[in-house]
């Protein structure tokens, strides 16, 4: 098993993450891809003299770019991409490999990502009609969540475990997404290529950062919405694409009724104007990128038979309203 960590200013959390992987009950090969960090996380890691392969990049390629860089340096049949702010249960790799053995039909196995308090980060992913994605069971106590071993849409982006053959069939992540929704678009391609994901509740990973650190942010909103729209144009039936403005407006209205938070996850003041600007920028950029997305759509429809029909079935199978 090869495990690749994406690092950007990970501080001491990076070293802790590497140590938890090297402490597994089965051997794993650990790689670290540094996205031009400005802190001392890589220097501190080197001082520990740990058995890991470090790739230092001169510029920040974003999450997807770093994932692609790691994939180019991985050779194992089972591969993992993950954030640096994680701590892996000592039996995680063993449980994960056992699940892969039990499910030879699965291209990926999703871990149970949770806080040490027992709050779940994600079990799977569910979708709204406009491709709005929500992590299944996010924020629930583990006693309240459905954590049966079951088929899910794909892995939570914090830690993705997959067979090499599945990643090769899906192709590279789209580095132009930079942040957010890139793993969702990628896992649509996994599904379209015929590779399913099984959720393994025994494979436990602890997410050290509270989810609130990234929950409300105009920057996150911009990238999430822009990349959601780009993915919708690439994959959904055109009848659904034409409905995106209306469905998006309905969702924004529903969210607005719930109230706008007073501050973002990093404690900065958050205004309705900043949210509206982020949404407007996302839609304008998505519109500007439309010619490119239509070209990608043609490529996907050539590569994956009945791509739009299959994408529609995926939405129905993992619907928020199910």
Indicate residue ranges for each PLM-predicted region:
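Active-site-adjacent helix/loop segment of glycosyltransferases
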Residues: 4, 193, 197-294, 312
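Short, flexible, basic/aromatic active-site loop/helix in glycosyltransferases
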Residues: 129-152
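Conserved donor NDP-sugar-binding/catalytic core segment of glycosyltransferases
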Residues: 87-128
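Short, acidic, metal-binding catalytic loop of nucleotide-sugar glycosyltransferases
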Residues: 19-28
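A conserved acidic beta->alpha catalytic loop
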Residues: 20, 34-43, 59
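Short aromatic/hydrophobic "clamp" motif used to bind/position activated sugar donors
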Residues: 79
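Glycine-rich, basic loop-to-helix element that forms the pyrophosphate-binding segment
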Residues: 56-74, 84
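A short, conserved alpha-helix in the catalytic core of glycosyltransferases
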Residues: 153-204
């Amino acid at each position: 098993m090869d495990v690749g960590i994406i690092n950007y200013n990970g501080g001491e959390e990076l070293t802790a993450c590497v140590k938890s992987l090297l402490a597994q009950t089965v051997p794993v090969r650990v790689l670290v891809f540094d996205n031009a960090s400005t802190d001392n996380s890589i220097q501190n890691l080197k001082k520990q003299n740990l058995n890991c392969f470090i790739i230092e990049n001169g510029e920040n390629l974003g999450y997807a770019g770093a994932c692609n860089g790691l994939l180019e340096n991985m050779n194992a049949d089972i591969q993992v991409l993950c954030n640096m702010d994680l701590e892996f249960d000592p039996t995680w790799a063993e449980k994960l490999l056992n699940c892969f053995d039990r499910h030879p039909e699965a291209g990926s196995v999703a871990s149970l990502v949770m806080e040490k308090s027992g709050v779940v980060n994600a079990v799977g992913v569910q979708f709204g009609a406009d491709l709005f994605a929500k992590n299944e069971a996010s924020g629930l106590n583990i006693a309240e969540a459905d954590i049966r071993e079951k088929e899910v849409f794909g892995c939570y982006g914090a830690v993705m475990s997959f067979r090499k053959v599945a990643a090769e069939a899906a192709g590279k992540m789209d580095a132009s997404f930079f942040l957010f929704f890139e793993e969702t678009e990628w896992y649509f391609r996994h599904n379209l290529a015929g590779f399913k994901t099984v959720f393994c509740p025994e494979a436990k990973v602890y997410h050290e950062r509270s989810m609130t650190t990234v929950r409300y942010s105009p920057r996150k909103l911009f990238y999430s919405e822009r990349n959601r729209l780009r993915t919708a144009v690439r994959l959904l039936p055109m009848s659904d694409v034409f409905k995106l403005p209306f469905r998006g407006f309905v969702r924004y209205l529903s969210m607005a009724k719930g109230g706008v938070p007073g501050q973002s996850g990093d404690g900065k003041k958050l205004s309705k104007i900043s949210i509206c600007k982020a949404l407007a920028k996302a839609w304008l950029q998505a519109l500007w990128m439309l010619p490119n997305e239509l070209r990608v759509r043609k490529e996907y429809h050539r590569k994956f038979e009945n791509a739009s029909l299959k994408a529609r079935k995926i939405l129905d199978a993992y619907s928020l309203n199910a």
